[in-house]
Structures are given as structure tokens and as C-alpha cells.
Amino acid sequence: MDTTNFEDIRNEWIEQGQGHVFNWFDKLSNEEKLNFENDIRKINVKEVNKDYKNVLLNKDEQKIMKYEHFENVMTLNKIKEQDKKKWEDIGYELISKGEVAVLLLAGGQATRLGTTFPKGFYDVGLPSKKSLFQLQAERIYRLQQLVSERYNGSYDQDSKPIQWYIMTSEATHSETIKFFENKNYFGLKKSAFFFFSQAMIPCITPEDGKIISESGSKLSLSPNGNGGLFKALSTSGAIDDMRKKGIKYVTQYCVDNILINMADPVFVGYMHDQSADCGAKVVSKSDPKEPVGVMALNGDGKPFVLEYSEIDEQSKFKKDQNGQLVFNYAHICINAFSFDFLDRIAKNHLDHLKYHVAFKKIPSAHPISGERQSPSSPNGWKLEKFIFDVFPFSKKMVCLEIERSKEFSPLKNCGGMNLPDSPETCLRDISNLHKSFIENSGGKIDSSNSTICEVSPLVSLNGENLKNFVNDKTFILPIEINQNLNN
């Protein structure tokens, strides 16, 4: 904890040209002063000023001048079965040794979904009413069972569980920890969890880099983007924890993907087989105009994500000799990193990750009263780092193209509005996937009354273990197939 005299801190802020945030300090209550002081102590004001100057210097540099097609991609449904099995075997072996971890980005609140709780709490409407967090936890639980079955019980999931690193934000940290505690970690080992929070940084004015006060007693702070992960891994001790536990590969995903394939053995095995230190799962663009970032190579031949706003019109529609879009592979924030890569980023490259600017409407304090005001137009910058900005530092990067219908259905928008990426589309997609599990195992589906179908991850992770129960049977929807196998 910072024990520097608060008056010294105040003087430093004044010297750095940020003394205006204290304009209302003398009028605050004792409790407000204490909270304000705590906020101030978390911020390195010199670093804020440095970041602002760097943003100004880098604005032109961030315009991509040259880019090429990224070729190092394998398509999952076109891979030879022998290769897929080889990669799966490698992945399972790495998991059995306790060398694979999962890393969850869980800093988001479900504000666009009409709530203020962490997005991982959300229930999209499955018969079981399971939250996103529970679905993910049960997938890890089932994967550990499959590893144990594969190694005839010799794998000890108590001594070598799949480690789960969960990055929260200031808004979600304590609630997330309490949620898992109250649920007894869904049967997983408490020692397998490592919770840590990403940093909050001040919003600033574009014209002069002044820190914005949300009110007289509170600074306007926002999370530093998913690229803040790498510094948070270092400062929280997560990197040291990974080193101590012998982690070799870390698979990363976002909390809102209801179809996430946790610690996918094929993906990990593919990376290991290719001696890659960085990997990403990608999907084919649904349309040339789909507003997503795509994998590409920069002018130095290094992998990076070409954002939709950066790609020219001709390149959006450009096709190869097979009729496929040249810039076709959309980055969906499902990545994997070798531990050595993460360690190298934390030690050598944190300062090389540049901030990106978002011009936003940011509540600010009335200049006299200090009361919170909501602007009618954008008035400030939020600075964010992006997770994919580490890709150019990779020595070898590979991508695995997956099917959206099996592995990617994000929850972004509220329900009842006929919007994409909503609770309704998530429920539709997971139901369709689970219906395919039943049908591929010889069962039949009667969807005359409903389209909702749920197969518990504790029963089947990817369609395995169902044939003896569902073969030649008809299931009337809605249905939940759980551990009792009697619904």
C-alpha cells in the first residue's frame, strides 16, 4: 500500500498539471475525502501524462499503411482425422501433466443486457437456469473426467487440476469471487482458482490531456482494455503462480461466449505440435462487410489484427484463386499463449503495447458545484490496450479456423429487440448444438412445441457419452438432459 503523505501526492499532481481534480476537495465529507484519496493513490499521474503524449505521437503511426494475407491457418473441419487425433492426444497429455491453464476475461458488467451484475452471472434461459460461469466450470469439470478416463484413472485432478485464472475489473471483482465461493466453486478445487483485477485508468480530455473528474469526489476511471491483461498478470503475481505450477500453455477466452470450448485439447496440441508460442481461433467472415477485425501480416511480416476501420474497400472484397476472401479470418478473442511468451511479454514488452483511443461521452463534474453531469456529445478519451497487440511479438503464430455453430456465440445485446448476439441467439445456438449431439448419437428430436434443448456439460462435453441413452429414442422439446439422464 502507498504510504506517501497525501499532501506530497497532491503537490505532485499540481506539479504535473493535474491539480484541478482537487478543486472540490475541501468541501467533501470525511468519507468522500477518504474514497477520493484511495482513488488518487492508485494512479501514477506521471504515467498518465506520458500516456497522453504517446497517444498524440502514435496517432499517425497507428494508421496501417501496408498489410498482407495471413496464411498460417488450419481449418478444423478439413483437417485429416489422423492429424486431429494426434493434436488431441498431445493436448490431453499436456492437461494430464497439469501444464494447461485457462484464462478468463470477466471484467464486463451486463449493462447492455439491462443489469449491473457481472456478465458471468447471466442466465440466457436454459431449462437448468445455469449461468455462463456455471456452464464454463462444468465444462472444466467434465474435461478433467475425460482426461482421467483416458489415462485409466492415473490422472489426479486433485493434485494437477486445470488452473483457472480469472481477470475481473474493479466493478466485478468482489462479486465474482463471492459468487464462486457461494457455489462452492462448482465442485472444482479452490486451489485451482486465481482471481485478479485489471487496472483502472483515468479518462482524459483530448485537447490537453487533463484528467476528467466524474464528480467533485470521484475521478472518471475506466478499465484499461483487454490488453491490460499482460500487465495485470505481472503485477498480480499470476505469472509467478503459473511458473510455480509448471504451466506451459494458457488458453484465453471471454466470459460472454456461451459455446466456449474450454482448454480445447486439439487447439493446445496443434500449438505444441507446431512449436507456436501464440495461437488464435478464428472464424470465416459471414460477409465481406462484416465489421470485424481480421488476421493479417504487417509490413514487417508480423501477425496482427487488421481492424475493420483500417482495411480499404478493395481489400475487403479481394478473393484468392479459390474464391475465398483474402482477408477472411475474423479474430474472436479466443487465444492461446505459451507460458514463455507471456513471461517474455511481461518482462520486455509491456511498454511497447500502445493505447488506442475511444472518443466517448464521459460524465464530468460541474466546474463550480462538482455535481455529476452527463454530456450530450463525446467529450473525452478512454484509453484502451488490445490483447491482440502482442501478436507481432510472437516468434511463431498459428490460427485454427473453427465453426461458429459449434464454438462461438457471444452475448452482447439485450433480449426482446431482435438483435444479434442476444440471449435469444445464444439460447438458439446452444440448443442447436445440443440437438446435434442427440441426433449424432442416434436420437430423434420433436421440436413441434419448442426449440430449446440442453445437454449438461457434466453428461457430455462435445457429444460423447450419449449413444447408450439416446439411441432410437425421441425427445420432445424443451428438454434438459442432466446427470440423472431421465428427463
Curated annotation (Swiss-Prot):
Pathway linked to the protein: Nucleotide-sugar biosynthesis; UDP-N-acetyl-alpha-D-glucosamine biosynthesis; UDP-N-acetyl-alpha-D-glucosamine from N-acetyl-alpha-D-glucosamine 1-phosphate: step 1/1
Keyword Nucleotidyltransferase attached: yes
Pfam families membership: UDPGP
E.C. code: 2.7.7.23
Enzyme class: transferase
Gene Ontology annotations of biological process type: UDP-N-acetylglucosamine biosynthetic process
Subcellular location: Cytoplasm
Predominant place of localization: cytoplasm
A GO molecular-function annotation: UDP-N-acetylglucosamine diphosphorylase activity
Swiss-Prot/TrEMBL catalytic activity: N-acetyl-alpha-D-glucosamine 1-phosphate + UTP + H(+) = UDP-N-acetyl-alpha-D-glucosamine + diphosphate
Record carries keyword Ion transport: no
Binding-site list for substrate: N226, K412
Positions contributing to UTP binding: L105, A106, G107, G108, K119, Q198, G225, D256, K382
Swiss-Prot/TrEMBL keywords: Cytoplasm, Nucleotidyltransferase, Transferase
InterPro entries assigned to the protein according to its UniProt record, in alphabetical order: Nucleotide-diphossugar_trans, UDP-sugar_pyrophosphorylase, UDPGP_fam
GO cellular component, one term: cytoplasm
Motif (Substrate binding): 105-108, 307-308
PANTHER family, A to Z: LD24639P, UDP- GLUCOSE PYROPHOSPHORYLASE
Family: Belongs to the UDPGP type 1 family.
Protein name: Probable UDP-N-acetylglucosamine pyrophosphorylase
Organism name: Dictyostelium discoideum (Social amoeba)
